């Protein structure tokens, strides 16, 4: 049988103690490449690569070298070292581990907000804590099911003891979280299981003393399949070679049974095994797209919206729809004007915690995202991606009307207003409308008299930065505009254009009365006085 990526390596118990355990491979028809192509989101694709890397198991490859090469490829696709610095890669790993120790409901909620760092994830949780300070507050569930009271949520770790145990208040819970994967305790359990067979709690229905053949006592001893016959010997690290993840199962189990049991124990590395015992009865709801499983149907429903694009929560003000109720709450702050997140440095307020986190980088000067081509640094990876299109020439956003392409979606949106005639930015003073918000801001200075751009030499102020730049050339003597014909230079581009008409003979200003043409508009205006006098 062929092996496809996406199956979690697991140790599966046997009911009859006398039956021996054999090493098998699992077939899963899930194609990661197809799912990658179907999903246009870079962040979603990166998450798929992360899952594929973490769940990779030994396939029908010629040997360990090819398996290692495949793991390296998946790791590269996930961490993207060509874009991320060492610090960012470390941040991704820490963020992944932090999310893994969260209770399931919180884990889903945080993941759907796509935090870029551990700090951002913590801020999201702290914001959620404030929202649920009210004891009667409820956690949003799926539209098909009722909202779940916050204190009735079940912790991932606590669920192994009793699914009826209620959560502590969030503030207490945040202080008492423990990793679901404990290297010390779990590896000790793994070592004991290797020495004595698999010895698990009777409550989980595991056999007391099944036997393994040829397995080392060390918890880090993973094995490769040798041949395909029943009763094959298992090789230990002391026999040489490289090692991968393995699946032990009773030969009577079918492929579907094995797939359903595939989350008993996850073996993460060969040097430090960390087993996460998640009985399938506690996670019965599985996503058909990416293989994630959940304890509650409502959690699966929320997760599936990532793949389906369903957005059941609609804003009554503007009609915009969202996949999560929490997104709708954040969006509604645009209409209400609420800005709950304030910068302690400058007092500027924001309606999203993530926006505040990005803003703080202005004060700290943090620019961790560096361009490999020119060395320019940015505070956000999204800015770096946009910047790199300067070097690659990529313009992925195309206008359906004229075919013109742009490197940024915002530029395409502004361009399309030329075709639609849309002018969404209107002046409250005179009613004049503009295509861009920057044009409205500039226009409003006519009414307010604001002149924010001041010359450091003479103190003269201007309403536009371009006017200040032109003015400063008086002090510096700079004349950057040069005529290609005679070499004469000018302070303003308009002066150069007028001068070039001498060489070209172009007379752009024509009198409507007599048809006489002039090079300069001022000369035409003087000429027109002749007709008005008559």
UniProtKB/Swiss-Prot annotation:
SMART domains (UniProt xref): SCAN (SM00431), ZnF_C2H2 (SM00355)
InterPro entries (alphabetical): SCAN_dom (IPR003309), SCAN_sf (IPR038269), Znf_C2H2-type (IPR050758), Znf_C2H2_sf (IPR036236), Znf_C2H2_type (IPR013087)
Tissue: Expressed strongly in testis, moderately in skeletal muscle, pancreas and prostate, and weakly in heart, placenta, liver, kidney, spleen, thymus and small intestine.
SCAN box domain segment(s): 50-132
Gene3D superfamilies found in the cross-reference section: Classic Zinc Finger (3.30.160.60), DNA breaking-rejoining enzymes (1.10.4020.10)
Keywords on record: Cytoplasm, DNA-binding, Isopeptide bond, Metal-binding, Nucleus, Phosphoprotein, Repeat, Repressor, Transcription, Transcription regulation, Ubl conjugation, Zinc, Zinc-finger
Entry GO CC: cytoplasm; cytosol; microtubule cytoskeleton; nucleolus; nucleus; plasma membrane
Entry's Gene Ontology molecular function annotations: DNA-binding transcription factor activity, RNA polymerase II-specific; protein heterodimerization activity; protein homodimerization activity; RNA polymerase II cis-regulatory region sequence-specific DNA binding; zinc ion binding
This protein's record includes keyword tRNA-binding: no
GO biological process, one term: negative regulation of DNA-templated transcription
Chain positions of all zinc fingers (C2H2-type): 285-307, 313-335, 341-363, 369-391, 397-419, 425-447, 453-475, 481-503, 509-531
Transmembrane helix keyword on record: no
Covalent link location (Glycyl lysine isopeptide (Lys-Gly) (interchain with G-Cter in SUMO2)): 55, 171, 202, 251
Residue positions, PTM Phosphoserine: 31
Quaternary structure note: Isoforms 1 and 3 can both homo- and hetero-associate. Homo-association of isoform 1 is dependent on the presence of the SCAN domain.
Similarity comment: family membership: Belongs to the krueppel C2H2-type zinc-finger protein family.
Purpose of the protein: Isoform 3 acts as a DNA-dependent transcriptional repressor.
Name recorded for this polypeptide: Zinc finger protein 397
